[in-house]
Amino acid sequence: MPVLCLIRHGESLWNKENRFTGWVDVPLTDKGREQAKRAGEILKSLNIKFDIAYTSLLSRAIETLEIIIKTLGYNIPVIKDISLNERHYGDLQGLNKDKVAEIYGKEQVRLWRRSLKVRPPNGESLEDTQKRTIPFFERAIKGDLELNKNVLVVAHGNSLRSIVSYIENLNEEQILNLEIEPAVPILYDYDINSKKFYNKRILKI
């Protein structure tokens, strides 16, 4: 049975500063690099051989993947695609989340960050993000799983939320409460015959 592994990048500089990041290209912190290394160590302990890896065009995801591959100790073909970029936070990008909450209220910020359909000003909703992530997921990532390949995906909180909510067929309330932690591997087995994902594992240690 092929395996799909989803991993959010490690802590970035703007994660540490509690700022909306979106498509702004900011680096990992030292903590983020350590988180990525730990994710690689966890995967190495499982003895899963990944056949292909996918990531976004943003350096925090790319570097996380590079650290994981180095820790695994073998080469994996890597495909980088804009479809896996974080959702675009529009006018919120670069702003401190607490300060935005002081202006607009915590509930409005929660809806901007976690709901399916509410867009931040001049930005993408999660539903908008799904319109680019899911076709790519179906075509490329699921296409590789259909070929019995083990697939590693390193991306972003919301690009991965869009994929997880699709895989698990979550409703809007479940999506609102869905969190993806930095550098914590999420694994699914994929049944080629039934076309279904099952046996979800979140490998937090």
Residue ranges and their predicted role:
Residues P2-E11, K106-R110:
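Short coil-to-beta-strand
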Residues E107-G123:
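Extended, charge-rich low-complexity interaction segments
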Residues K200-I205:
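Short, solvent-exposed aromatic-acidic interface loops
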